């Protein structure tokens, strides 16, 4: 989304900072409050992995632009005769137009990436809010399920600024549900893209749900096996969860160390270039997928249907 400077919503007092969870991917799973905040947002700082379908909702209910129209451009006088001299007869000299002092308010939201470490992001949010602008911090997933965002919130809590937190549906529960994997009341979630207590994770009650990218999976699997998990523990890797591009691959914990398993050359595999975040479900619940795989088993799922039309 193109960055546009916007003067919408500027007030004499500090603005509100609203953390909004984007949910697992499907914009239909956003909360009603999240949709309202995003639709009226003029300034948004977003995570890079927020889906485009969610970003498309930003600012969709902002009022139309206001302010003066651009000044009309004076047309040059027409040439008269073959001499090429301008015909100025009957045209009085006009003084230059005075500029209109009223401010022009450009249309469209201002969407920027949330850059830097959590302290830097929090400082940026606070700086903008102190100018009187309402600021939205759009977070992939659920705000208070992400350590870095918790740090941002804690930093803002030490200021006098007003903030709000709009939860998002965590992908660590939504994606297994869309993959037909019931988690029950006891399960363990870990993001293996950062520091992990592997001994505690391997001993934790299952099923295990991991946040990872494809590059993290071999080492994560190898380490979990070293700490006592069986190498044949059933595992499902899901990409693009809750969207129409969702793909899940069933394998074992040892299978995560095999690049061919994740390459997904066949129609049931992962996209060949799976660069984004994956949700990995590990444990006996994988056995339920055969009968509870309601999303990816739908008729024509994953097909592109062309509808011919006459001219």
Show the residue positions of the predicted features:
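Short gly/pro/ser/thr-enriched loop/turn and capping motifs at secondary-structure boundaries
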Residues: 51-53, 170-174, 217-218, 242-245
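Glycine-rich, flexible N-terminal cofactor/catalytic loop recognition
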Residues: 7-70, 93, 98-114, 304-308
């Amino acid at each position: 989304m193109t960055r546009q400077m916007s003067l919408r919503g500027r007030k004499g007092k500090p603005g509100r900072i609203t953390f909004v969870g984007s949910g697992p991917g499907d914009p239909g799973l956003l909360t009603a409050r999240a949709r309202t905040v995003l639709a009226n947002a003029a300034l948004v700082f977003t995570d890079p992995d927020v889906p485009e379908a969610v970003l498309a909702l930003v600012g969709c209910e902002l009022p139309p632009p206001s302010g003066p129209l651009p000044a009309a451009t004076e047309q040059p006088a027409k040439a008269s005769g073959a001499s090429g001299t301008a015909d100025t007869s009957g045209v009085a000299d006009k003084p230059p137009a005075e500029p209109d002092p009223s401010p022009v308010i450009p249309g469209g939201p201002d969407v920027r990436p949330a850059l830097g470490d959590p302290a830097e992001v929090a400082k940026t949010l606070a700086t903008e809010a102190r100018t009187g602008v309402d600021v939205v911090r759009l977070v992939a997933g659920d705000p208070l399920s992400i350590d870095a965002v918790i740090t941002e919130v804690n930093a803002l809590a030490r200021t006098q600024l007003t903030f709000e937190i709009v939860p998002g549906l965590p992908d660590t529960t939504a994606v297994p549900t869309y993959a037909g994997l019931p988690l029950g009341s006891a399960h363990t979630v870990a993001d293996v893209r950062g520091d992990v207590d592997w001994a505690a994770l391997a001993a934790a009650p299952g099923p295990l749900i991991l946040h990872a990218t494809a590059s993290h999976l071999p080492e994560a699997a190898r380490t979990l096996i070293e700490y006592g998990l069986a190498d044949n523990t059933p595992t499902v890797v899901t990409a693009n969860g809750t969207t129409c591009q969702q793909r899940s691959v069933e394998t074992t914990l040892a299978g995560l160390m095999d690049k061919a398993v994740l390459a997904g050359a066949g129609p049931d595999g992962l996209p060949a270039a799976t660069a984004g975040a994956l949700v990995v479900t590990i444990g006996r619940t994988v056995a339920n997928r055969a009968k509870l795989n309601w999303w990816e088993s739908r008729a024509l799922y994953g097909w592109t249907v062309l509808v011919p039309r006459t001219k």
